[in-house]
Amino acid sequence: MKRWLMVVPLALFLLVAVFLYRGLYLDPAELPSRMIGKPFPAFNLPTVHGDKTLTQADLRGKPALVNVWATWCISCRVEHPVLNKLAEKGVVIYGINYKDDNAAALKWLAEFHNPYQLDIRDEDGNLGLNLGVYGAPETFFIDAKGVIRDKYVGVIDEVVWRDELAAKYQALVDEAKP
């Protein structure tokens, strides 16, 4: 009987260890977002420039990318020139400045240019939390009704845009046409 009492905890420990070990190799970019198919979460936040307050209603009307970024994010610095080029080509991009110092964000946008039609300031990270953001950069695709249709985790470079994301964005644009 005592031998059985020793085997059960050992078996449970090994089972937990296997699950934890397996979890180390899961790619967060491969995890589906719980927000896909749901309306963009409610929020009431200032712009980075502080000139007005935005809500989720401001994101409705046209398909867009919603890019989560921060000045402390090295990958965001790599991605930013590509976002500028996309904005110049007419891609609608909204930005969420995530858990960042607002003065640093203003300096960043002045120095590297602002690809965002709307720039939401999420200093405390609550909007990011409601979106299920793991870090930055993350980009959500929203339709004209403000529903999240897809999510991309990681740097959007020209190859990723061309090979993976451009068609998804164009499908949302085509869907919004009358």
From Swiss-Prot:
GO terms for biological process: cytochrome complex assembly. Residues 25-178 are periplasmic. CDD domains: TlpA_like_DsbE. One of its GO terms (molecular function) is disulfide oxidoreductase activity. Residues 1-3 are cytoplasmic. Belongs to the thioredoxin family. DsbE subfamily. Involved in disulfide bond formation. Catalyzes a late, reductive step in the assembly of periplasmic c-type cytochromes, probably the reduction of disulfide bonds of the apocytochrome c to allow covalent linkage with the heme. Possible subunit of a heme lyase. PANTHER family: THIOL:DISULFIDE INTERCHANGE PROTEIN DSBE. This is Thiol:disulfide interchange protein DsbE. It comes from Pseudomonas fluorescens biotype C. The gene is dsbE.
